[in-house]
């Protein structure tokens, strides 16, 4: 067919929606392959809309049903704005951004629930719902569930980005006000829910349980264009990430000080599955770290990065 995709890994991995969206800007926009970006994003957008509207999953794109796919789609579109400006971004992708935001607000994304405090929650007890997707016998090794830190950082970012797309349109003034009000609620709830007394962010919060594992998902929360944290709060989180997760190869998937740390991906398939997200570094997360560093330190951070 005429579709274009990015494979997660050849030949053993398929096309997976969240991974494809995370990789898309770097694989296309960063090397001036605009047409490839638009072709791949067009396929993804159509697949996502079809899934939300009818429940039909794309034949080739796997994990279109993972709840954060919609959030990563908006993030990937936001990167298009970085390269080609807000006007072109709004013209080409404004409709799908609004579609996704409204679908989330109206509870139309399966296993993605908006709560009275504005935060999003999901059920990851029985199957993985984030990139920490290792399983044994089909069950997630890291059962992140409830309020997940990067979900809600991406949600706040999505709301503020939608505001930026539509704030110049007088006909959308009421809609923009609604999104701004919701974003403010999300911001307050995010800080109350995730920012702990140690100065970093809980990885996920499920009822009375708050996961203290120091993981790189907090780097996503402080590296987004719109973060719910102020500069001082971001600096404290950044210090934790720098001290416990930063390596020359990327960010560790778990701090050496956290329970279960295992930096070596060796052994039989079960041993490797247990280890894969318990310490080994991920290069792609360094992009969020670099963005966060520049947001805190400005151009003075260039020599460090």
Q: Where are each of the predicted segments found?
A:
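Extended, well-ordered alpha-helical segments in internal regulatory regions
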Residues: 161-167, 221, 225-228, 288-297
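Short amphipathic alpha-helical coiled-coil/interface segments
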Residues: 97-100, 179-194, 305
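Active-site neighborhood of glycoside hydrolase catalytic domains
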Residues: 150-189
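Amphipathic, soluble alpha-helical interaction motifs
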Residues: 26, 76-79, 107, 161, ...
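Acidic/polar, glycine-enriched structural segments that form the non-catalytic walls/loops
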Residues: 1-12, 87-88, 98-106, 166-168, ...
């Amino acid at each position: 067919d005429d579709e274009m995709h990015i494979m997660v890994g050849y030949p053993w991995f398929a096309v997976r929606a969240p991974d494809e969206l995370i990789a898309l800007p770097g694989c296309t926009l960063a090397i001036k392959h605009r047409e490839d970006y638009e072709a791949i994003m067009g396929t993804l957008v159509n697949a996502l809309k079809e899934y939300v509207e009818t429940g039909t999953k794309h034949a080739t794109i796997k994990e279109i049903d993972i709840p954060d796919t919609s959030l990563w789609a908006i993030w990937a579109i936001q990167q298009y704005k970085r390269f080609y400006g807000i006007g072109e971004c709004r013209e080409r992708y404004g409709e799908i951004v609004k579609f996704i935001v409204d679908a989330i607000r109206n509870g139309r994304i399966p296993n993605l629930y908006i709560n009275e405090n504005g935060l999003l929650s999901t059920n990851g007890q029985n199957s993985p719902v984030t990139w920490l997707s290792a399983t044994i016998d089909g069950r997630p090794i890291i059962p992140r569930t409830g309020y997940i830190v990067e979900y809600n950082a991406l949600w706040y970012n999505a709301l503020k980005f939608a505001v930026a797309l539509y704030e110049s349109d007088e006909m959308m003034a009421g809609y923009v006000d609604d999104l701004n009000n919701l974003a403010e609620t999300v911001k307050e709830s995010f800080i109350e829910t995730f920012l702990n007394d140690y100065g970093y962010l809980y990885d996920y919060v499920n009822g009375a349980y708050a996961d203290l594992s120091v993981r790189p998902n907090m780097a996503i929360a402080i590296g987004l264009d719109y973060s719910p944290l102020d500069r001082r709060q971001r600096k404290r989180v950044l210090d934790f990430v720098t001290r416990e997760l930063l390596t020359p190869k990327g960010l560790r998937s778990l701090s050496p000080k956290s329970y279960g740390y295992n930096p070596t991906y060796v052994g039989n398939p079960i041993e490797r599955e247990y280890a894969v997200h318990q310490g080994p570094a991920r290069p792609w997360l360094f992009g969020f770290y670099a963005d966060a560093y520049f947001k805190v330190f400005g151009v003075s951070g260039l020599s460090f990065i």
